[in-house]
Design a protein with these regions (language model features):
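Bacterial N-terminal signal peptides that target proteins for export
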Residues: 1-9
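C-terminal motif of bacterial Sec signal peptides marking the signal peptidase cleavage site
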Residues: 18-21
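Bacterial signal peptide processing site
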Residues: 23-25
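A cross-family detector of function-defining hotspots
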Residues: 27-28, 32-37, 42, 48-167
Length: 167
């Protein structure tokens, strides 16, 4: 079930970020930004359960944030439009190739592929023989303007890529 969720979130990331503003300088989270303190569930940027949108945005406003309102589909919203007081889940996703976060638009352009084909491209056996591919995201659950849960999840496509070939 978790692998299927990660697969869906990966595809959602690809499709949702296609509506992001073009030509803007993008910031990328590093692999260490996805680490959580095991005891406090605090992110490396100091965000923890119980924090509000002000603390969250101070740490993550410059990054791509996908939002799911009341359990709906994840979509990109400008930070000023994210309804933090609703029942909300936000994710900060990244694909890493050979240890570096990738800009999806640039990656697709450089490799001559359509965004809709990115997941197939990244999970292709011949590509995985030459590269390491990791999908990571931080997931924040919100209720009444406060963070109620934080999780860091990932999918190592080199280890688990065969799952995607079958689905």
């Amino acid at each position: 079930m978790a692998k299927k969720l990660i697969s869906i979130l990966g595809l959602t990331l690809i499709l949702s970020l296609s509506v992001c503003a073009c030509g803007e300088e993008k910031s990328f989270l590093s692999a260490t930004d996805y680490e959580l303190d095991a005891e406090t569930a605090q992110t490396i940027r100091g965000v923890k359960i119980g924090d509000d949108s002000e603390t969250f945005l101070a740490a993550y406003r410059d990054y791509d944030i996908l939002s799911s309102i009341n359990g709906g589909d994840y979509r990109f919203l400008p930070v000023e439009e994210i309804p933090f007081t609703s029942s909300l889940t936000t994710i900060l996703p990244s694909f890493f190739v050979d240890g570096s976060a990738i800009d999806l638009d640039s990656f697709c352009e450089e490799n001559g592929i359509e965004k809709e084909s990115l997941l197939s491209f990244l999970t292709d056996e011949s590509y995985l023989e030459m590269h390491t591919v990791l999908y990571q995201y931080l997931l924040f659950t919100w209720e009444n303007g406060k963070i109620t849960d934080i999780r860091s999840e990932s999918m190592d496509y080199n280890r688990d890529g065969s799952y995607y070939e079958a689905n």
